[in-house]
């Protein structure tokens, strides 16, 4: 398996833009002000990706295990991350088969999570922490309003259908992993980026911390920005939702002059903006891949037949 490579002008300016776009992003700053534990998950995910790019697969799997230990959803990053580790692995005198490489890293992740869970059991003295941490993500007992799409739907849901739709929502979230990994198997780093954006929209309890992580990864693909078609519309929608979201929340929760539809409507707009951005950047990367494979078609219009 080989990575899809395209010459891109990665200068010191772009390197500066990449790290500054994450560190000085308003969403990142707001996350730090809120002091949530999600920053630990973000750190673990970035460390896992960094080590995967460097070819340190074992360290990458340890970091992914820690991220999955803190919250479940990072474990869905395993397929593209293992492909990235395999593509970037250091050459050895005894080449390792792909199956052996995958099984070894699966064992590393499983062993790490097993050790972390037993460490938590040793500290707390019981397994009750499982339902208080992972059970919250899987069963969605807390329907506190947030920027996600789950809470309002399950407020209106009849209890008899709750378990069914919990399975449907989790199946929907995890269904992107296989398709994107297979279709973009030569660009696993982009698969990781697009999955982080999907998680920021469709996970049970998303926050602006997830959004800041996705935005921090986007500048890695600055060379496909000219191929995007609707950046103004997407930016306007996100800015609109960012400014009105807190106002609608205040009107509903504190002022009492609105209802749940006010805030949920703006969360739909928020999710729409990011969904359009995901679709646009995905099209741009696929167009870039097509132009790399067919240089004679570069700059020509695509028509669907």
Predicted feature locations:
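Active-site rim elements
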Residues: 135-140, 162-165, 199-202
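Multi-pass membrane glycosyltransferase architecture that uses lipid-linked
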Residues: 1-128, 166-305
């Amino acid at each position: 398996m080989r990575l899809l490579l395209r010459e891109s002008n990665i200068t010191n300016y772009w390197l500066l833009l990449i790290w500054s776009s994450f560190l000085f992003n308003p969403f990142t700053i707001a996350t730090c002000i809120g002091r949530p534990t999600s920053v630990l998950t973000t750190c673990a995910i970035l460390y896992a990706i960094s080590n995967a790019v460097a070819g340190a697969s074992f360290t990458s799997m340890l970091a992914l295990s820690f991220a999955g230990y803190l919250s479940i959803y990072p474990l869905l990053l395993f397929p593209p991350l293992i492909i990235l580790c395999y593509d970037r692995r250091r050459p050895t005198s005894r080449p390792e088969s792909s199956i052996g490489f995958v099984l070894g890293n699966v064992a590393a992740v499983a062993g790490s999570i097993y050790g972390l869970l037993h460490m938590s059991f040793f500290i707390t003295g019981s397994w009750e922490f499982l339902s208080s941490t992972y059970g919250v993500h899987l069963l969605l007992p807390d329907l506190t309003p947030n920027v996600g799409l789950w809470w309002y739907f399950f407020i209106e849901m009849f209890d008899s259908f709750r378990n069914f739709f919990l399975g449907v929502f989790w199946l929907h979230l995890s269904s992107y992993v296989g398709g994107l990994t297979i279709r973009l198997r030569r660009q696993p780093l982009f698969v990781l980026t697009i999955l982080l954006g999907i998680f920021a929209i469709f996970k049970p309890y998303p926050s602006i911390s997830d959004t800041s992580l996705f935005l921090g990864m986007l500048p890695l693909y600055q060379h496909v920005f000219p191929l995007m078609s609707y950046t103004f519309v997407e930016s306007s929608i996100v800015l609109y939702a960012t400014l009105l979201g807190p106002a609608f929340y205040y009107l509903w929760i504190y002022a009492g002059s609105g209802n749940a539809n006010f805030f949920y409507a703006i969360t739909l707009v928020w999710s729409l903006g990011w969904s359009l951005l995901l679709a646009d950047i995905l099209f741009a990367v696929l167009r870039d891949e097509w132009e790399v494979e067919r240089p004679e078609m570069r700059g020509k219009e695509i028509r669907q037949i």
